[in-house]
Amino acid sequence: MLSPKRTKFRKQQRGRMRGNANSGNKISFGQYALQALEPSWITSRQIEAARRAMTRYIRRGGKIWIRVFPDKPVTMRAAETRMGSGKGAPEYWVAVVKPGRIMFELGGVVEEIAREAMRLASFKLPIKTRFIVREED
């Protein structure tokens, strides 16, 4: 699963997800992409599950690019712990995804295979997504 090797600080505040993605919203590497339509936190487990679903479907052909990285720690307190005594320990990592963000890219396969692979990956994610094709310049 994806996680940072090291960070400047162990814990982070939750923050807010306002507006649309203003970076990472164009196709950069592949021919096809999966674009987020809703704001959400995507966990490293969800990213890995989506990657596996796509890899299994396309088998040996094609290349997958993962365009989101879980760099935000989410802390949790132990179960049945009383209030107070500080913030919990980091439990898992999430990527903050805003609407318009390209999450996965795919190249080297025909469109039907890419569309189905992205559809299978989208079932592993907690948000609505859409399949987009790179416009030829």
Swiss-Prot record:
Gene Ontology MF terms: rRNA binding; structural constituent of ribosome; tRNA binding
Keywords for the protein's UniProt record, in alphabetical order: Ribonucleoprotein, Ribosomal protein, RNA-binding, rRNA-binding, tRNA-binding
Keyword Hydrolase recorded: no
GO biological process terms on file: translation
Compositionally biased tracts (Basic residues): 1-17
Region of interest (Disordered), residue spans: 1-24
InterPro entries: Ribosomal_uL16, Ribosomal_uL16_bact-type, Ribosomal_uL16_CS, Ribosomal_uL16_dom, Ribosomal_uL16_sf
Cellular component aspect of the GO annotation: cytosolic large ribosomal subunit
One Pfam family matching this protein: Ribosomal_L16
Description of how the protein assembles with itself and partners: Part of the 50S ribosomal subunit.
Protein family (similarity comment): Belongs to the universal ribosomal protein uL16 family.
PANTHER family linked: 50S/60S RIBOSOMAL PROTEIN L16, LARGE RIBOSOMAL SUBUNIT PROTEIN UL16M
Purpose: Binds 23S rRNA and is also seen to make contacts with the A and possibly P site tRNAs.
NCBIfam families associated with the record: rplP_bact (TIGR01164)
Name of this chain's protein: Large ribosomal subunit protein uL16
The encoding gene: rplP
